[in-house]
Amino acid sequence: MSDAAVDTSSEITTKDLKEKKEVVEEAENGRDAPANGNAQNEENGEQEADNEVDEEEEEGGEEEEEEEEGDGEEEDGDEDEEAEAPTGKRVAEDDEDDDVETKKQKKTDEDD
């Protein structure tokens, strides 16, 4: 059993050394390590960055298409309801506070 543990730790160390070596090589070549911390070759890093940009553009494009395809009234109606809901709750909370203050004032007035 102890042999397996030693083998596993040596594999991790080798992997770490390879990653550090790649990072050092990239730094020497004037390239920074990828932001995600994974040392990758230049081609893979560029492909991943391009894919992330494409996904963001696609997501933004889909939202615009949905707005154009659907009736604006339905979507706007939902948004208005959501916007009004928190405001209504705040008003209700304020009313409760006012009631408490009014009761306190009445008690004070009665005592005088």
Curated annotation (Swiss-Prot):
It is found in: Nucleus. Residues 43-84 have a biased composition (Acidic residues). The modification N6-acetyllysine is found at K15, K103. The keyword Phosphoprotein applies. Residues 13-31, 101-112 have a biased composition (Basic and acidic residues). It comes from the Eukaryota. The modification Phosphothreonine is found at T8, T13, T14, T102, T108. There is a cross-link at K103 (Glycyl lysine isopeptide (Lys-Gly) (interchain with G-Cter in SUMO2)). The modification N-acetylmethionine is found at M1. Residues 1-112 are annotated as: Disordered. GO terms for molecular function: DNA-binding transcription factor binding; histone binding; histone chaperone activity. The modification N6-succinyllysine is found at K15. Pfam families: Prothymosin. Its main location: nucleus. The keyword Phosphoprotein applies. This is Prothymosin alpha.
